[in-house]
Amino acid sequence: WERLPIWARTEILDKKIRVFTLPGFEIARKATNRADLQLRMQGNAFLGAFFKVSPLLQDFDINNDQFEEVVRNQYQKKFGKLGSAVIESNMEVMTQGFSRVTEIKVGEITAADRSTLRGLPMLPLSALPPAELGEGCATCRSHPLPEGQAERTPVTQVGVFDSEFRSDYGYDQPASPLAAMSVMAAGTGDTASKYVARRETPLFIPENCTQCMECISVCPDTALPNCSQDIETVLRTAINNYVESVDDRAKLNAHVPEIEKRTRSLMNDAVGGKADTPFPELVREATSGLNGFSDTSRSQFLSIIEQAPVAYNKVNAIFKGPEKKNPGSGGVFSIFVSDLCKGCAACVTACGDHDALRMVAETESVNAEHETGTAFLDLLPDTEQKFLGFYNDEHPVDSKTATLRNHLMVRRNYDALVSGDGACAGCGEKSVLRAIASITEAYMRPLYHAKADRFSQKAGELRQGGVALLAALAALHPEQHQLFVRTVAHTIMGLGGDSEKDTDVRLEQHGPISDEDIVDALATVLEQESFNHKDLQALDGRLDNGQCVMAMAAHTGCNTVYGSTPPNNPHPYPWMNSLFQDGATIGWLFGESFMVDHARRSVIPERLADTLINKLGESMTAQDYYDYTHFSDNLMTDEEIKELPKVWIVGGDGGMGDIGYQNVSKVMLQNRPNVKAVMLDTQVYSNTGGQNSDSTPMLGGSDMNSFGAATQGKGVEKKTVAETFLAGHGSPFVSQISIANAPKFFRAILDGLEYRGTGFLQCFTTCQPEHGVADDMALDQAQRVRDSRGAPEFVFNPTLGETYEEALDLKGNPHSDKDWYTTKFKSTGEKYRYTVAHWCATEARFRNHLKRIKDESKIKDLISLENMLIRITQQDVVHRYHLNPEHRAFVPDFGVFAKVPGPDGKPQVVALSRQLVLFCVERRKAWRLLQSKAGIVNKEYIAQRTLLVDVDSGTVSKEELFARAEELFEERLLGSPAAVPA
């Protein structure tokens, strides 16, 4: 009762509403050990609870046995193919919900109000207590509009949007231009809270952190903001913002050099002795002998230090390494957990055995601790270059690839996608979108600021001496002066017409144009562009560090549902969705318009300014005038192209690989320099219920697939969209990449941005509900599908050469010269070859294709997968020899077995469907084609080819092949010729 808000209590009492509670999540967790089902099955508990408390059963005279029989029959229809155990577990959850639903006791309306479900955070002195805050201000950004920037139009203001969509109108939502035009303010998810959406939350253990950045790279929800700081900065931030007494604040600040020195000494001792002493304990010890200020102030200072998550013990690149090279230079590293977290636990899984993050139950006290931490973070400066190692914040392209994760230590990059949206917990798409946004911000923002400084300087030079320079030009070369004035009037002052005659008329109507007018026009445009690129506040309340560096055009799909459903969208930049298939062409239009604006507002004004300032007396010809008045990207330098705002086309494998494929193909062929595309490859129509796409594996596996005697899934080879752009599409930059390898992923994005042409990235993205995996598995599944050759990594960079061998890079795939990657079972050390069958065994969507064999004595009647794969090629499948019992390539349905890692890591034997074996063959063939393009000689392919030539010619009998396939294969492999036999 105390957790219900006053308005709800009032309505409950007035309307005599009965209120019930149900421990649905607890019930579901006890019913299954599958993490992906433990939260989702609570819906079955609600089903039972609903029928228990509603009058339906009583009104229709249905007893409990009849009710359970009806429900069981429905479960039989839905889950019967999965076996009786699945039906019984669902029945157990339902009946538990029926029996455990409890009516709460209605209390007094004046009872204590704990409806926020939150504890009280420790806030800085500048922040008012929650009770004194205006509605919505507790989480709002506080940066004012910069001087010289006009107020935004109402349709783009977050406040106006919130007044309509965050004001509890419900079904009484008023009609407005926002709704009529389907317009949202940008980045509204920034002020959202996911507190009620998560059951558990990650807890940061600083003493175990190594600053590997893996957790931060995989987090889909911008929920792990982080930074590195000098020790002194942390100490002074705590003193200046949390110690109330002004006098004591000054005294403590005077002691900071001594506190910092003592703390650093203790830190060095702890690191040298490999101790895990927490940072707050060291600060407490360092201040223990200091006096001259009150105990209250000491307590206030130490209290916030205890709440601030500070790591030093194992963050060698931040503390130990710098300290060793230059004593006194080591810093500290912090990870904060924000209220945007959905509790997916992807970060905890990525952290793994480091144990620097642990999932804990979300409680009022844990929430208060996290809110305290993020409030402290907002007071800290951004991470300095000295803590970023070989990541170059001013020139990210020059960074070492292994350090590219460090770009996420810079807050302006980290906040490039704000999250707060309604994407599923752990959504693999979000991790990719966040990387796209953060890398683009990291790449473009320094270019913008350098451009702004350059423009500001040139505008100043024009203001100071431009008129005199024009007068000198008129005296020396009157024709060039006249042509220069005409060019500025035409391109900058808006007096150009559709033809020479039209322009002449416009100029005559305007009247005389003085040299002062020309200089003022050029300088004004340069000054405005300088402001726009460095000082403009693009979004309400956010940093005033320049206009957006990118825009996004989206194909309809999951990304547009969570990307544009009021009230929370994650995009702090221009974003548009039109139709399912036309995101690519919309993005192309964006790119063209950006190039026109860039030419008119930046390139042409700067070039004309340079002509006047640096090239006085050089010829200004009629051809120059023509070029300026018919300007295009063909005339831009590489540097001018880099400074172009970028466009990212985004969509799923359905929108971009199926129905919208022709649009994407068209855009790739144009090779526009600022248009890039990323396909979020969930391998299924995730948003519309699980239909197959061309990118869906041969197994199908989605909700819309049938499995039985007539069909075992999709049955068609997988289309890898990225591979189709390696030929016949001009010269685009192409990559198939994912968060499986974050540094290489970030590098591919950077190289795509650098490339003067269209870029395309195909990124495998886990869809937890459609793939049947737990919320924390996006990283693991991306690695598994890569390692299995299901979605191998590659980068095709045309700048490297005009042959596939030069331009195509397969680095990052394990054992890239082999058919399959060889690994070991963790529990036994036994080696095995990791095929797509092994990846499929980890996703519930493929469960129909694998049957567990508990009695391993039965495998004597089955064929090992290794043996079977030696017997068969893709051409055997094309000719349907796999269906001929007399042929060497015959694949018996569930007559092939493999050992796969079980849930406990131990090997377990499974029989494979015929379709799964064919999927292995198909993926091997696709991988071999990639290898050949990259110039990699696969001796295993040669060995298999030579062996099968001998079998088909009768030199080796079919019986011997069946009995000794692996042995014969190894013999051929050891003596493998250098070329494939004809």
Where are these regions (language model features)?
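Active-site cofactor/cluster-binding pocket
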Residues: 1-140, 567, 691-692, 701-708, ...
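Short internal beta-strands
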Residues: 1-2, 555, 676-681
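Acidic, Ser/Thr-rich peripheral helices and adjacent loops at domain boundaries
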Residues: 1-13, 370-400, 572-574, 693-718, ...
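Short acidic, glycine/serine/threonine-rich loops at helix termini
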Residues: 3-6, 31-34, 214, 229-231, ...
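Conserved thiamine diphosphate
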Residues: 16-19, 410-411, 415, 604, ...
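Ferredoxin-type iron-sulfur electron-transfer modules and their immediate structural context
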Residues: 83-335, 340, 348-568, 572-638, ...
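Thiamine diphosphate
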Residues: 101, 214-218, 430-435, 535-538, ...
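Flexible, low-complexity linker and terminal segments
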Residues: 137-160, 186, 196-225, 233-237, ...
